């Protein structure tokens, strides 16, 4: 199945609480969880690339400039049509600008079919995305969650998720990627809903939205 509606998220949350009753207080306090679903394609991937390693506020500011420059959520061709001066003024790091150009060229040429990739199983889809320089595991996982509706992905490399899991379970220090991955195994086949839950917990505890944007 895929996560395609708020009802799917609600179902997943109910199932999660049955799987792991420790999540019940979080679920009761934080539901309903947001769907956060975008159409598969260049705009969704680009939004996630922009979100890499920066605050949500910074990412949204940069994204707003991209949308303004391209006249809407950017198609690959519209992004490639931007001149160098405009791209330089978007606020992107050199690495992100390079990644966006590489991805846009691949999409425009047909060598990267983001709709088809979103429909693949997790391992194959991640393998096809991460061959592109600048698209790592976190970016691929978030794309599949929020543009493909994959129900069972937990991006353990996400610092906010690790902090939220550690806080919820009383860890003295933020758990590492391996520890969080092991904890999240218990939440199959709804790890993507668990990720939404812990992003919501992080936002509630810190007052800062950390879930990556793809819409």
What do these predicted ranges mean?
Residues 11, 18-48, 53, 57-70:
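A positional/architectural concept
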Residues 24, 31-33, 40-43, 52, ...:
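Flexible, active-site-adjacent loop/turn segments at secondary-structure boundaries
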Residues 1-33, 98, 122-123, 137-215:
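C-terminal accessory module of base-excision DNA glycosylases/AP lyases that mediates lesion recognition
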Residues 45, 58, 95, 156-157:
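A generic structural signal for residues located within well-ordered alpha-helices
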Residues 47, 51, 64, 68, ...:
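Generic alpha-helical structural context detector
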Residues 44-49, 65, 82-86, 124-128, ...:
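A general alpha-helix detector
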Residues 3, 22, 26, 54-133:
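Alpha-helical ds-nucleic-acid-binding substructure associated with the helix-hairpin-helix region
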């Amino acid at each position: 199945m895929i996560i395609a509606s708020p009802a799917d998220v609600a179902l997943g949350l109910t199932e999660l609480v049955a799987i792991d009753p420790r999540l019940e207080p979080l679920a009761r306090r934080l539901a309903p969880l947001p769907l956060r679903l975008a159409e598969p394609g260049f705009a969704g991937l680009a939004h996630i690339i922009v979100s890499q390693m920066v605050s949500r506020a910074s990412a949204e500011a940069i994204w707003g400039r991209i949308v303004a420059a391209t006249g809407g959520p950017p198609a690959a061709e519209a992004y490639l049509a931007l001149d160098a001066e405009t791209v330089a003024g978007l606020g992107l790091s050199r690495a992100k600008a390079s990644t966006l150009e590489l991805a846009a060229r691949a999409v425009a040429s047909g060598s990267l079919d983001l709709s088809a990739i979103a429909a693949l199983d997790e391992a194959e889809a991640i393998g096809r995305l991460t061959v592109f320089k600048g698209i790592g595991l976190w970016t691929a996982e978030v794309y599949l969650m929020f543009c493909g509706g994959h129900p069972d992905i937990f991006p353990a490399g996400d610092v906010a998720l690790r902090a939220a899991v550690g806080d919820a379970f009383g860890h003295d220090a933020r758990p590492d990627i391996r520890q969080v991955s092991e904890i999240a195994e218990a939440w199959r086949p709804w790890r993507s809903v668990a990720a939404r839950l812990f992003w919501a917990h992080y936002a509630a505890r810190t007052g800062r939205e950390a879930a990556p944007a793809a819409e």
